[in-house]
């Protein structure tokens, strides 16, 4: 079935409290998607943001982002007052997330809500605290990660948010007696982090249930690696490559290439795949099972790393000293499917790939990705629409690309613009520089959007900012840039009925509309 969807981070939704959340704007966006005939809402990872405010460098592979908890819902529950919300600063620009301000204000308000909640639960049924039944159900269902996460975050707070490798040895090495004593002395702080995850889960499941009832699937995102400064790394031990002192032996990155003479040193700990194999890939089964409870479809980032990955000594200052190692290949995905059934995975397979990576993708039968901004460098490029395949997902650009408007005006080379203009029939087949310069940005953007929608690929995902025609101000992430990423927010009212009708009409031309919407249109003719 041909279908289409929109990439829109939760953080980019409008709202009064500094960042998008699971409030009314999320439900309104689902209504917008449904009206536009869309069947997929693609998100960035919903995990807590970490280094550089990136959702791909999180403190947990399982926890949800506290920033996304809807504060107005907590107010309706009597856990916050209007005065509590007005007392905090939420940033100066409603179109940009100010993460520094948000870090202070959000947690201050969430702690007030937690205090009110504990007060409500105090003394019930003869207990010091008797929490709601669904809270106990949540903590029981998620105890395999929640207990460690809450303890880890309480320890982070006690250690002034330092990386766990800088903690005192008994905490760093997880001395059972020391951790038990800390947990007993810090029950309220540990409870706070559980409370936030409980509210995150309840609110998100309400949004997801509403979306599914409207015929909208949620496409989530799973980074392949965990952050070095994460509860997963602190607890994981043998899951990762360790040296004799129990520290990470090697870390992840990319080799030197045309774009970077030193390569990219990401710093994420590498998995000890031999150990994972011994466990039957239990941790990965746990991780994917958890993700399937949050999302309907899963995009797996850096899919090539399951075939071959670049391993760099942890002491290196550049990626030059790394070498290629073999990943688990199909053995991992066979184990996942044996435990979880057919996997609704989309593989992020971008970049230069070894033949073995392409074979892994083919063997897995997962759809790969095609990105139009990569298509026009010359020759019979694999990203050109005529080279797409049915079992695939086409994008004008991903979150790492700039917007189509900015790409056409500033990012594309002269050769790329000339190639694209000819390919998209915006100019003669061999255009002059003057003919290319005469192509209007709006015309180029529309042609690129239609090229994506017209692709043979079963799915087309268009970033929201490209439907809106926004420029560089909406560029979500520039790889390698420190600060200023992940900040774009949409204006209130961006999801208008007029735009929904326009999107529905464009998608209907290429038979990508929600079947119910398309059937109604056909009956009306």
Roles of regions detected by a PLM:
Residues 1-37:
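Mature N-terminal, pre-catalytic/accessory segment of carbohydrate-active enzymes
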Residues 9, 18, 53-197, 201, ...:
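Alpha-amylase-like alpha-glycosidases and glucanotransferases acting on alpha-linked glucans and related
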Residues 24-49, 294-295, 452:
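Catalytic domains of carbohydrate-active enzymes, especially glycoside hydrolases
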Residues 34, 204-212, 337, 361-362:
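Surface-exposed amphipathic alpha-helices with a cationic face
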Residues 193-226:
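Conserved, well-ordered alpha-helix/loop/beta-strand core segments that scaffold catalytic motifs
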Residues 469-524:
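Structured C-terminal cap/extension of enzyme domains
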């Amino acid at each position: 079935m041909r279908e289409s969807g929109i990439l829109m981070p939760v953080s980019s939704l409008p709202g009064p409290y500094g960042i998008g959340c699971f409030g009314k704007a999320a439900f309104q966006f689902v209504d917008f998607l449904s009206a536009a005939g869309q069947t997929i809402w693609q998100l960035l990872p919903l995990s807590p943001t970490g280094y550089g405010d990136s959702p791909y460098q999180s403190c947990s592979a399982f926890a949800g982002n506290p920033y996304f908890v809807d504060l107005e819902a907590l107010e309706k529950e009597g856990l916050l007052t209007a005065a509590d919300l007005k007392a905090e600063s939420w940033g100066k620009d409603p179109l940009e997330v100010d993460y520094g301000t948000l870090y202070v204000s959000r947690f201050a308000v969430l702690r007030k809500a937690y205090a009110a909640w504990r007060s409500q639960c105090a003394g019930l049924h003869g207990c010091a605290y008797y929490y709601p039944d669904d809270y106990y159900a949540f903590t029981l269902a998620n105890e395999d990660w929640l207990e460690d996460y809450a303890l880890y975050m309480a320890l982070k707070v006690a250690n002034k948010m330092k990386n766990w490798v800088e903690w005192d040895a008994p905490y760093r090495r997880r001395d059972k007696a020391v951790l038990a004593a800390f947990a007993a002395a810090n029950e309220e702080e540990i409870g706070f982090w559980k409370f936030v995850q409980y509210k995150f889960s309840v609110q998100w499941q309400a949004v997801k249930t509403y979306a599914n009832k409207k015929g909208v699937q949620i496409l989530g995102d799973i980074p392949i690696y965990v952050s070095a400064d994460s509860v997963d790394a602190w607890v994981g031990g043998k899951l990762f490559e360790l040296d004799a002192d129990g520290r990470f032996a090697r870390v992840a990155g990319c080799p030197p290439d045309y774009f970077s003479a030193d390569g990219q040193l990401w710093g994420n700990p590498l998995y000890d795949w031999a150990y994972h194999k011994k466990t039957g890939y239990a941790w990965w089964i746990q991780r994917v099972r958890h993700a399937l409870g949050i999302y309907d479809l899963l995009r797996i980032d850096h899919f090539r790393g399951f075939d071959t990955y670049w391993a760099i000594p942890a002491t290196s200052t550049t990626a030059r000293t790394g070498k290629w190692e073999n990943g688990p290949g199909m053995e991992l995905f066979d184990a996942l499917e044996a435990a979880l059934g057919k996997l609704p995975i989309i593989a992020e397979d971008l970049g230069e790939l070894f033949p073995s990576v392409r074979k892994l993708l083919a063997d897995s039968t997962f759809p790969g990705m095609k990105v139009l901004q990569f298509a026009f460098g010359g020759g019979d490029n694999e990203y050109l629409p005529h080279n797409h395949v049915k079992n695939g997902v086409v994008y004008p650009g991903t979150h790492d690309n700039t917007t189509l408007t900015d790409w056409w005006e500033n990012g594309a080379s002269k050769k790329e613009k000339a190639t694209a203009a000819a390919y998209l029939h915006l100019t003669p087949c061999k255009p002059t520089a003057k003919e290319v310069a005469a192509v209007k940005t709006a015309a180029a953007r529309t042609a690129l959007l239609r090229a994506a929608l017209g692709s043979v690929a079963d799915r087309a995902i268009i970033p929201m900012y490209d439907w809106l025609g926004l420029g560089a101000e909406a560029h979500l992430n520039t790889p390698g840039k420190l600060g200023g990423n992940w900040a774009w927010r949409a204006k209130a009212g961006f999801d208008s009925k007029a735009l929904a009708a326009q999107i529905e009409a464009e998608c209907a031309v290429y038979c990508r509309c929600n079947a119910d919407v398309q059937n109604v249109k056909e009956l009306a003719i």
